[in-house]
């Protein structure tokens, strides 16, 4: 009986060159990958170096002295603007305070001018009271003179008398206390019981009147 050996023959075993071929292929691929990474890293390094060079060139082109001059000019402008604002604010406050003072003085002394116009009237009245002569004619003349002085004071103070006899009734300037039969047209002022007065077109006191009744 012929026996066959389980040991492979030399012809069945791979040669040394065949065994090393897969290892050589893997090594080549790894080397190629490393080379590609190295190339990319080198390109990135060159790009970064280029950017740094551009930045350095831009910084070198900046005139530091000019920038400092511009900064100082801007600071000076800001200081001037602040001073102008502070000055304007102070002036506005002074104007407001002066305005308040003027209004307060106007309220306090509004009657001062008119009071001065009335002083001659007071003098005449006091002189009339001091007269003990008992002369009625002289007393009347004194009263008439005093009345003229009072009218003059009213005129200076822009006070106007309302004596609307024969005028149409005006509810803004007249106060009717009754309606009476009369020959005048209806709503015509027939009589003035108490004269009214205005101050610069503002009614101080309406005239008390009677008015013609409708026929």
Curated annotation (Swiss-Prot):
Q: Which InterPro entries match?
A: GrpE (IPR000740), GrpE_coiled_coil (IPR013805), GrpE_head (IPR009012)
Query: Where along the chain is composition biased (Polar residues)?
Result: 1-28
Q: Where is this region: Disordered?
A: 1-52
Gene Ontology terms describing biological process: protein folding
Q: Which residues cross the membrane?
A: none
Give Gene Ontology CC terms: cytosol
Establish whether keyword ATP-binding is in the entry.
Answer: no
Composition bias of kind Low complexity appears in 29-52
Oligomer and partners: Homodimer.
Its job: Participates actively in the response to hyperosmotic and heat shock by preventing the aggregation of stress-denatured proteins, in association with DnaK and GrpE. It is the nucleotide exchange factor for DnaK and may function as a thermosensor. Unfolded proteins bind initially to DnaJ; upon interaction with the DnaJ-bound protein, DnaK hydrolyzes its bound ATP, resulting in the formation of a stable complex. GrpE releases ADP from DnaK; ATP binding to DnaK triggers the release of the substrate protein, thus completing the reaction cycle.
Name of the molecule in the record = Protein GrpE
**What species is this protein from?**
Ralstonia pickettii (strain 12J)
Upper classification of the source organism reads: Bacteria, Pseudomonadati, Pseudomonadota, Betaproteobacteria, Burkholderiales
Give the gene symbol: grpE
